[in-house]
UniProtKB/Swiss-Prot annotation:
Keyword terms: Cytoplasm
Cysteines engaged in disulfide bonds, as pairs: none
Signal peptide stretch: none
Full protein name: Protein C10
């Protein structure tokens, strides 16, 4: 018989703001910033490598923060937290702004070629 799933932590909007703020701050801790930078450099802006190298480091950093709020210390906890944040994004502009900031810490900036740098026409 399968056991009942663990109770998902519930956070109020205010609590979600606090946790999200702590997660963002965790990426600024020198040790974590160095880990992320090393993973990004190893990935060489290749999206496949970003998923293999950067995402696991980012997940670990988030797990270190959110486990104190009842989320499990596995990838599932980060996914549940992300769903909770997504739900509150539409209700709270501060959470929406922090969510954008967190995503910018996780995803590489999209580099687009300069306009006019295509194939020369002659």
């Amino acid at each position: 018989m399968a056991s009942a799933p663990a109770q998902q932590p519930t956070l109020t909007v205010e609590q979600a703001r606090v946790v999200l703020s702590e997660v963002i701050q965790a990426f600024s801790v020198p040790e974590n910033a160095a880990r992320m930078e090393e993973a990004r450099e190893s990935a060489c802006n290749d999206m496949g490598k970003m998923l293999q190298l950067v995402l696991p480091v980012a997940t670990q950093i988030q797990q270190e923060v959110i486990k104190a709020y009842g989320f499990n210390n596995e990838g599932e906890g980060v996914l549940k937290f992300a769903r909770l944040v997504k739900m509150y994004e539409t209700q709270d502009p501060e959470i929406a702004a922090m969510s954008v900031k967190l995503k910018s810490l996780l995803l590489p900036p999209l580099s687009t070629p300069p306009i006019g740098s295509g194939i020369p026409t002659s």
